[in-house]
UniProtKB/Swiss-Prot annotation:
Its main location: cytoplasm. Its EC number is 3.6.1.-. It comes from the Bacteria. GO terms for biological process: nucleotide metabolic process. It is found in: Cytoplasm. One of its GO terms (molecular function) is nucleoside triphosphate diphosphatase activity. This is 7-methyl-GTP pyrophosphatase. Nucleoside triphosphate pyrophosphatase that hydrolyzes 7-methyl-GTP (m(7)GTP). May have a dual role in cell division arrest and in preventing the incorporation of modified nucleotides into cellular nucleic acids. Pfam families: Maf.
Length: 200
């Protein structure tokens, strides 16, 4: 099997990829993540996923490199990180009783063949009606000030939601695993077939 590389230092993406039980390396991509003028959220995450995968190709010239990027959008506005309690309160008040769409760009890049396959996977989070007490209790417990949207869906943030809507819960955490299996197959890697080789 060709070397598999995750173009990310995110511990959450690493944990998700480990579910496939394939050996892989992690590499940090140096990419300018500034959005371009009039760029849609979907176009932004697809472009950045591709750029992140290609950014580590000089280190791994004969590999399949996975790139991923995610933004959260509410009422057509890309959500930033709150950085402090007061900003987080404003964000969560805005989300109360509403929904947020996460767009995750996913790319698998064959650095030997210069072949790129990419897609964008949406995932929708519906929020409960949140009281000021709910918001304060949550923020004091989890302090998600470095998280876009002011919550950690993989932690206590789940208490804020009324419903999750999407094809793959891994997408919400940053790596659409079902779609990744399909992209790897298009690049010639059958994840289940590789398991039999690994156990020999």
């Amino acid at each position: 099997m060709k070397t598999l590389v995750l173009g990310s230092t995110s511990p959450f993406r690493k944990t998700i990829l480990e579910k496939l039980q394939l050996p892989f390396h992690c590499a940090k991509p140096n990419v300018d993540e500034t959005e371009q003028k009039n760029e849609s959220p979907q176009a932004l995450v697809e472009r950045l996923a591709i750029e992140k995968a290609k950014a580590v190709s000089s280190e791994y010239p004969n590999a399949l490199i996975i790139g991923s990027d995610q933004v959260a959008v509410c009422e057509e506005e890309i959500l930033g990180k709150p950085h402090n309690f007061d900003n987080a309160v404003v964000q969560l008040n805005k989300f109360s009783g509403k929904s947020i769409t996460f767009y995750t760009g996913l790319c698998v890049y064959d650095s030997e063949k210069d072949k790129t396959i990419a897609l964008v996977e949406p995932f929708i989070v519906h929020f409960n009606q949140l009281s000021q007490k709910d918001i304060a209790n949550y923020l004091n417990a989890e302090q998600p000030y470095n998280c876009a949207g002011s919550f950690k869906s993989e932690g206590l943030g789940i208490c804020l939601f009324s419903k999750l809507e999407g094809d793959d819960p891994n997408t919400l955490i940053g790596l659409p695993l079902i779609k990744l299996v399909g992209l790897l197959k298009q690049h010639g890697i059958d994840v289940l077939a590789e398991q039999s080789k690994l156990t020999v």
